[in-house]
A protein has these predicted regions:
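Alpha/beta-hydrolase fold nucleophile elbow
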Residues: 277-287
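C-terminal catalytic histidine-bearing segment of alpha/beta-hydrolase fold enzymes
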Residues: 375, 382-421
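N-terminal cap/lid segment of alpha/beta-hydrolase-fold proteins
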Residues: 36, 148-192
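Short, hydrophobic beta-strand segments
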Residues: 82, 92-99
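Short beta-strand/loop motif that positions the catalytic acidic residue
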Residues: 360-361, 367-369
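Hydrolase active-site cap/lid region
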Residues: 291, 295-340, 396
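Short beta-strand element of the alpha/beta-hydrolase
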Residues: 185-189, 195-206
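Cap/lid segment of the alpha/beta-hydrolase catalytic domain
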Residues: 194, 207-268, 319-328
């Protein structure tokens, strides 16, 4: 087939190095993340499998590799029989022409048994998912924000001695948001400082509430507001929105995320109202649903100086419906429940789709992506990211799914925000 090729390379390596001290009578398989599984330009994507022969005699392996689009459509199938010398190894490499920018699924099987499945990326910054915002998108959100501003926040701030620590004092915050809904959060303030930057942390979908860091020196750098949106986390006890995602989906005016997005803005209102906060240095961060909230905050409110979303949710529902099992089932189920075409549901969702907010973002953005994410597939992350025109950068973690390596990502995020302090 034109554009396809494979390469077999046999390499002798010390058995103790290969097996990490394990001596099992079996052929072992190990995937090598060539180029961290992200490819650009003229370079063909390459996938490799290392075969380790633990036997004392020659062994054969019937290896197959299937390359598919992230939608599941098969593109290429490779088959190769390999002979591996006793206590030796062989590296099998397959390369292929990626037909277009995007993410591709790779499935390795040996003797018809699946042994490894993973995703690779090709030119993710060139993925095209055009705006599908309705004509009244901007006016809808302008009106919604005006309605939020008609609600007096009635901030209540009470010191929480139990959660306070060496470097920061924590306060329980209660306030009124869109349509009079009460929402809650934790406000952590650096001790001994009269002026400081602040970061708003938006939480993931259904996340269990967590307290701010108060006992490591790094946390003294800025204040932090961890906000719980309506019906979730600190507000779970008062939840009247069911499973949140499908609540009120029949109309844009009643959909759950209309109010939740306004809770995102109300959190900014609170931080901005604090006298000691440096108003030019308010940041936003969060993962999954919190990543979506971070991007919404940056799009709808120019008081945010920079944003750091990771594995963002709520993006590119037209493609998300095909890529995400849970989301696809939820959207199709809602269409069936309402007895309407799926296109009608997607029209409603377009008002809440992150990619339709992306062009409104003016502040710098850094995004973290889990290449193996099946909850918020990386395609959907880049659908919105690629429409952002402000300064931006991204980090792809090749072996991670919906959870990034915490220490690594936190360091990236910290260094990013430090540039604006």
């Amino acid at each position: 087939m034109k554009g396809l090729k494979y390469l077999i390379v046999v390499v002798s390596i010390c058995a103790s190095t290969l097996l990490h001290g394990q001596m099992k009578d079996t052929i072992a398989y190990r995937v090598e993340p060539v180029n961290n599984w992200v490819f650009f330009g003229d370079e063909n994507p390459v996938v490799e499998m290392v075969l380790v022969n633990n036997f004392m005699n020659m062994q054969k392996s019937n290896l197959s590799c299937v390359i598919s689009k992230d939608t599941g459509e098969p593109l290429y199938t490779f088959k190769q029989q390999s002979s591996v010398a006793p206590k030796d190894s062989a590296t099998v490499s397959f390369s292929f022409n990626a037909p277009q920018p995007g993410f591709y699924s790779v499935v390795f099987s040996a003797d018809d048994k699946q042994i490894k499945k993973f995703n690779i990326a090709y030119e993710p910054e060139k993925i095209v998912s055009p705006y599908d915002a309705q004509k009244d998108f901007n006016s809808f959100w302008d009106l919604t924000i005006l309605q939020l501003h008609e609600i007096k926040p009635e901030y209540k701030v009470v010191k929480n001695k139990a959660l306070s620590g060496k470097y920061r004092t924590v306060y329980d915050v209660t306030m009124k948001s869109f349509e009079g809904e009460t929402i809650r959060g934790y406000w952590a303030v650096p001790k001994g400082k009269k002026n400081y930057p602040a970061v708003i942390t938006y939480m993931g979908y259904g996340a269990t509430p967590w307290a701010p860091d108060v006992n490591t020196p790094e946390c003294a750098k800025m204040a932090e507001f961890i906000i719980s949106v309506r019906g979730q986390a600190l507000n779970q006890e008062y939840n009247k929105y069911g499973d949140w995602f499908t609540y009120g989906m029949s109309k844009k005016e009643t959909y759950y995320y209309r109010g939740a997005y306004m809770d995102v803005i109300r959190a900014i209102d609170f931080v901005y109202s604090r006298e000691a906060v440096d108003k030019t240095k308010i940041f936003a961060q969060g993962g999954s649903q919190g990543g979506a909230f971070t991007l919404v905050a940056c799009a709808l409110d120019d008081r945010i100086a920079a944003g750091a979303p990771h594995v963002p949710f709520m993006s590119d529902f037209v493609d998300y419906e095909k890529l995400g099992k849970w989301i696809g089932a939820a959207l199709r189920g809602e269409a069936k429940k309402q007895d309407v075409e799926l296109s009608k549901i997607l029209e409603t969702m377009s008002y809440f789709d992150i990619k339709n907010f992306a062009g409104k973002i003016k502040c710098p953005i850094v995004m973290g992506v889990g290449l193996q994410d099946i909850v918020c597939p990386p395609h959907t992350n880049f659908s919105g990211y690629n429409l952002i025109t402000s300064p931006k950068e991204y980090y792809i973690y090749p072996k991670n799914g919906h959870s990034l390596p915490i220490k690594e990502w936190f360091k990236v995020r910290e260094n990013f925000f430090d540039k604006f302090l």
